[in-house]
Amino acid sequence: MLVISANEQRKLVNMNEVIAYAALALQEFSAERTITPIRTSLPFANEQNTALIMPSVAEGLEALGLKVVTVVPENKKIGKKTINGIVMLSDFQTGEPLALLEGSYLTMIRTGALSGVATKHLARHNAKTLCIIGTGEQAKGIAEAVFAVRDIEKVMLYNRTEEKAYAFAQYIQEKFGKPAYVYANANEAISEADIIVTTTNASTPVFSEKLQKGVHINAVGSFRPNMQELPSHAIANANKVVVESKEAALEETGDLQVPVREGLFEASDIHAELGQIISGEKAGRESDEEITVFKSVGLAVVDIIVAKYLYEKAVERGVGERIEF
């Protein structure tokens, strides 16, 4: 079995390739060619902490694996990662364990890739400005993916802890060579954005202003019913709300459950799963005036396909450590 660390994965990753593999996984899922149960969510130690268990099989892509990840928001106060995890990949024919991959970095790039796919199909082609609300680790992968699919010229940042936003602004300037500005108010930060990303653990909406026409949102932070990043009017007034899995999104996120409860949105109002747009079964953006929302809660099959991509690259390049059971 091959063990692949976060640093080793970092050297293997090409974001455009990861975006392509994520799109393939989404398409297989929406065509009902995978077995991807709704993940098991286990609270532990306190009500904020969550352990997530996510298996998946993708027959057509010959992939079998399991992801286990923990989310501990308070870890940031003691200088530790808030997301920790592992992904186990098994041989599709024999069931033997093939690889064990560090899971927090993989989660970051897969989360980014999902937003990259959504941005490619749902943001305006001429989108130039990106607003990121929440500047933790997950935001790095999303920024990289959005930059990969759109010609971003300016980035606006908002974070509850301003120092982290300034550090992220420096990261943007160094990695992408584009100006990044920190705002003290989230409503001001979104005011001139073509693309908005929310990646927080907020339980109440992170902005309140009405959205401008033509904007696209990637909302990735809320993965539990008691978490809500988007104001209900953002969901209710969107022309298209898109998800990875309708069943999972409706069961798992307050971003949809709250507006449904308030009578502002119905399950049938979800425009499409992202895989249906990739395949051409449903339309993506159809005009520059549309407001589009991608509400992401993650999808195990994408993790497993990205893990397989990393495993195959690692084998090809002789990266990782072989261990015997």
Curated annotation (Swiss-Prot):
UniProt family annotation: Belongs to the ornithine cyclodeaminase/mu-crystallin family.
Pfam families listed in its UniProt record: OCD_Mu_crystall
Gene3D superfamilies: NAD(P)-binding Rossmann-like Domain, ornithine cyclodeaminase, domain 1
Record key words, sorted: NAD, NADP, Oxidoreductase
Coiled-coil annotated residue ranges, if any: none
GO molecular function: oxidoreductase activity
One GO CC term on file: cytoplasm
InterPro entries: NAD(P)-bd_dom_sf, ODC_Mu_crystall, ODC_N
UniProt catalytic activity: L-proline + NAD(+) = 1-pyrroline-2-carboxylate + NADH + H(+); L-proline + NADP(+) = 1-pyrroline-2-carboxylate + NADPH + H(+)
Main function: Catalyzes the reduction of Delta(1)-pyrroline-2-carboxylate (Pyr2C) to L-proline, using preferentially NADPH over NADH as the electron donor. May be involved in a degradation pathway that converts trans-3-hydroxy-L-proline (t3LHyp) to L-proline.
Enzyme Commission number(s) from the entry: 1.5.1.49
Protein name: Delta(1)-pyrroline-2-carboxylate reductase
UniProt keyword Zinc present: no
